[in-house]
From Swiss-Prot, chain A:
The name this protein goes by in its record: Dynein light chain roadblock-type 2
Keywords: Acetylation, Cytoplasm, Cytoskeleton, Dynein, Microtubule, Motor protein, Transport
Pfam families for the chain: Robl_LC7
Top-level taxonomic group: Eukaryota
Biological process according to GO: microtubule-based movement
Lineage: Eukaryota, Metazoa, Chordata, Craniata, Vertebrata
Functional note: Acts as one of several non-catalytic accessory components of the cytoplasmic dynein 1 complex that are thought to be involved in linking dynein to cargos and to adapter proteins that regulate dynein function. Cytoplasmic dynein 1 acts as a motor for the intracellular retrograde motility of vesicles and organelles along microtubules.
Length: 96, 785
């Protein structure tokens, strides 16, 4: 358990990372480093998007599965790593 | 029915019909019922006229029919007065009726056909007689026909049919139909209802995608397998345990924090974040191929990629490096200390190239790690050898340290799991070679050629051996203690050697037997000594560990990974080996020489090419100048004098330089001739100001480079300072000597010369400090140089 905590801390303190959050299977955020309203917004929207992406990948080949999702925008990059029950979202500003 | 109905009506008319009651009451006047009308005699004698009509008293008098024509109900005037009192259906029909006639006709036909049949079957004599009475009455015919009919019954039946058919077409109903209908008793209907409480409801919605179906099937399969397993291991104890375990697991699940399940995702995210941060390095790793290698004449470079370091291992030197045989991006770093006086703890870190900021696995131990290796078949097993002589095995699958301690007799040196090395001699299990003068640091077999191996030692040399021959085939002197050597996995002629001065040398015997095709400092500070080097099995990268605990990953440029050209019919792998054998044989003819070539060989190209200089480099050269001055020196070197000086400078990086310079009084021209080995021919042209002189040097390649020599003199006579800065027409600075004009670099030279003057002879001994500054980005050679 401490390992995961450490990993999350490392991620949060990594260069360029704006925020991290852990969202459960229903789209409810469990842990976050951002403020409430932003978190809720991100959680809701990204949860849906991840489900859609996962459904797409698996529809094409049911033995395949989504590993991660990256959305690169002008301002920053949103990275989503889905798990069986949880969703880990990290927003980073790639240093460029 | 109708008769019965009529009868009933007559009987009932007593009470029903209004007129009837009155008549009956009056005819029975003698008997006085109690409700009889009390009438006077006059009224009694009144005569009432009654008329008998043939009307049916029971017939309705006011039948109303709906007239569709007029659209109203209309009274019908004419009413049927017929009253049927009795009727019965009989079975006699009148002769003249249709039915009677038909029957009669039919009977006649029957008789006639019988006769004709008789004619056919019996003797033809009777034909005329039979035909005669045929037309007679049916009765007479029938009588005579009877015996005939009986005789020829069967035939007549057939005959009967055929004459009947054309005459009689209409078949009437022979049966007496009567329609009967009856209505069953209709049971009264009853509605019975019952209402219960509605069952609890929930809304359920789902999608049926391809993958949902697949998942359902997979679940089913798993369930089946589980049940199979349960059946196999069925004991009451096991059941109990199972239940307990189940309970425990459920308990734990509800208790444990949700965070532990995010482990996998967190790992992935960490790698992604690192990928973003080190994006350019990752891209370089994958795609960058140094294009300048084409111009570099077979030499290559090492491109620094990631740097791996961990705070916990900061003080510890890297003592071992090993790539994982299965996962080509995972490597193990063993930390310990080479200082035999100071021994502290050790660490084993496993890094993945996908995450350069934090190791994947960390293990710490009490004693320093000296060597490590990974199991080929079970890539999760790592064996390490400690300084205190213990050997431990770590299982990466389990999170805890699992040692299998075995103390060994050797008290920790570089214990390669295969080889044992001793201090003074390199010894095989079969043989002993007199190899090195000092400690042998590493020995390694060639991965392709089974006879060849090499060894490196702190005596600055790397030697390549053929194990059947006692003397080494090749010896390389690297000017510094060699920490480690490694063969490249992709070619049998390429190997790398790392030295304690922070340089990595890469040799390719098929390209250049005597020299490195790349030597490059790879660690930032000169204090860092590189301790180990390893090639990655598939990627063109090497990892280099130093004594500060840092591991640097470098990419080999294309020139360093040249594959030998495939010859027809020969496998590529064996090719280089064959080549080596050839070289071997060649050298054996000349085996007395140790084949160590000085780096300053005339044919060799300039060594400074192909090396990435550190941002600055200094060299000190000793310069002895003898000057003959026409006028004894009073103020340094005056341009108005004729002076002849010969200088010889020696420096570790420079060629011996002999320079002859003559200054002629007009001070416009000075000629200096340098001996060819310095590759430089300088022509001095002394200029106006007394302490400034301009010199033009002519390089061997016939390019003119002006360089500015600034002379200054200090108060102390015997000492004069001269500095030189040269300017290259390409805009960058270069120095004519001692490096030659091969590189345009910023060079500053400060030299301190002590002059001993005796009359007109002046002897100067000077130390020059040449400072060479690397201008980053200016790797391409100067057009003038």
């Amino acid at each position: 358990m401490a390992e995961v905590e450490e990993t999350l801390k490392r991620i949060q303190s990594h260069k360029g990372v704006i925020g991290t959050m852990v969202v459960n299977a229903e789209g409810i955020p469990i842990r976050t480093t951002l403020d409430n309203s932003t978190t809720v917004q991100y959680a809701g929207l990204l949860h849906q998007l991840t489900m859609k992406a996962k459904s797409t990948v698996r529809d094409i080949d049911p033995q395949n599965d989504l590993t991660f999702l990256r959305i690169r925008s002008k301002k920053h990059e949103i990275m989503v790593a889905p798990d069986k029950e949880y969703l880990l979202i990290v927003i980073q500003n790639p240093c460029e | 029915m109708a008769s019965r109905a009529a009868r009933k009506r007559d009987e009932d008319s007593v009470t029903e019909v209004g007129e009837g009651t009155d008549e009956w009451a009056q005819s029975k006047a003698t008997v006085r019922p109690p409700d009889q009308l009390e009438l006077t005699d006059a009224e009694l004698k009144e005569e009432f006229t009654r008329i008998l009509t043939a009307n049916n008293p029971h017939a309705p008098q006011n039948i109303v029919r709906y007239s569709f024509k007029e659209g109203t109900y209309k009274l019908i005037g004419f009413v049927n007065q017929l009253a049927v009192h009795y009727s019965q259906v009989g079975n006699l029909i009148p002769k003249d009726s249709d039915e009677g006639r038909r029957q009669h006709y039919r009977n006649e036909l029957v008789a006639g056909s019988q006769e004709s049949a008789k004619v056919v079957v019996s003797e033809p004599d009777l034909l005329e007689e039979e035909e005669g009475p045929k037309e007679a009455e049916a009765e007479t015919g029938s009588q005579t026909d009877v015996p005939a009919a009986e005789a020829a019954e069967k035939v007549t039946e057939e005959e009967l049919i055929t004459p009947k058919q054309p005459k009689e077409q209409k078949l009437t109903n022979q049966f007496n139909f009567s329609e009967r209908a009856s209505q069953t008793f209709n049971n009264p209907l009853r509605d019975r209802e019952c209402q219960m409480e509605p069952p609890p409801r929930t809304n359920f919605s789902a999608t049926a995608n391809q993958w949902e179906i697949y998942d359902a099937y997979v679940e089913e399969l798993e369930k089946q397998e589980k049940t199979k397993e349960k059946e196999k291991t069925k004991t009451p104890v096991a059941k109990k345990m199972g239940k307990m375990a189940m309970r425990k697991t459920t308990f734990l699940e509800s208790q444990s924090d949700d965070i532990t399940k995010v482990t996998q995702a967190a790992k992935i995210i960490e790698r992604m974040v690192n990928q973003n941060t080190y994006d350019d390095i990752a891209q370089d790793f994958k795609y960058y191929e140094d294009a300048a290698d084409e111009y570099r004449d077979q030499e290559g470079t090492l491109l620094p990629l990631w740097k791996f370091q961990n705070d916990k291992a900061k003080r510890l030197a890297v003592t071992a490096l090993c790539w994982n045989p299965k996962y080509k991006d995972l490597f193990a770093v063993g930390h310990g200390s080479y200082d035999f006086m100071k021994q502290s703890r050790g660490m084993l870190l496993l890094y993945s190239m996908k995450n350069p900021s934090f190791p994947e696995y960390i293990f710490s131990s009490d004693s320093g790690i000296m060597c490590l290796d990974m199991h080929v078949d079970h890539p999760y097993l790592v064996v390490v050898g400690h300084y205190d002589g213990n050997v431990a095995i770590y299982n990466l699958k389990k999170p805890h340290f699992q040692p299998a301690f075995r103390s060994s007799a050797k008290s920790g040196k570089h214990t390669d799991p295969v080889w044992q090395c001793s201090k003074s001699y390199s010894s095989q299990f079969l043989d002993t070679y007199d190899a090195h003068n000092m400690a042998v640091d590493a020995v390694s077999w060639n991965p392709y050629h089974t006879k060849v191996f090499m060894s490196c030692s702190s005596d600055w040399t790397v030697k390549i051996w053929d194990h059947t021959i006692k003397t080494p085939m090749f010896i390389y002197d690297l000017n510094s203690a060699v920490g480690d050597v490694a063969w490249a996995p992709y070619s049998s002629t390429v190997f790398a050697a790392v030295t304690t001065d922070g340089k990595t040398h890469i040799f390719d015997l098929s390209i250049n037997k005597y020299e490195a095709i790349c030597n490059q400092p790879v660690v930032a500070k000169k204090k860092n000594k590189i301790t180990h080097v390893q090639f990655n099995p598939i990627h063109p990268i090497i990892i280099v560990g130093d004594d500060r605990g840092h591991v640097t990953c470098l990419k080999l440029s294309p020139n360093l990974r040249k594959m030998p050209k495939e010859k027809k019919g020969q496998e590529v792998q064996k090719g280089p080996a064959v080549e080596i054998a050839k070289l071997d044989k060649l050298l054996n003819l000349d085996s007395s020489q140790p084949a160590s070539q000085p780096r300053r060989s005339p044919e060799a190209p300039a060594h400074t090419e192909g090396t990435l200089w550190k941002p600055w480099q200094a060299c000190v050269s000793l310069c002895i100048q003898a000057m003959y001055l026409r006028v004894p020196p009073s103020v340094g070197l005056s341009p108005a004098q004729v002076c002849l000086f010969v200088s010889y400078s020696v420096s570790p990086f420079a060629f011996p330089d002999v320079c002859l310079c003559l200054c002629i009084p007009p001070c416009l021209l000075a000629v200096s001739v340098c001996v060819p080995i310095s590759e430089c021919l300088s022509i001095f042209c002394v200029s106006l100001s007394p302490s400034l002189s301009l010199c033009i040097s002519l390089h061997q390649s016939l390019c003119l480079t002006p360089c500015l020599w600034v002379y200054g003199s200090l108060l102390f006579l015997p000492v004069f300072l001269h500095g030189c800065v040269s300017l290259c027409p390409c805009g960058r600075l270069s120095l004519p000597s001692p490096w030659g004009l091969c590189r345009c670099l910023r060079l500053f030279c400060v030299s301190l010369c002590v002059c001993l003057a005796a009359r007109r002879l002046c002897l100067c001994v000077g130390l020059s400090l040449y400072l060479r500054l690397w201008v980053s980005g200016s790797q391409s050679p100067c057009l003038w140089g």
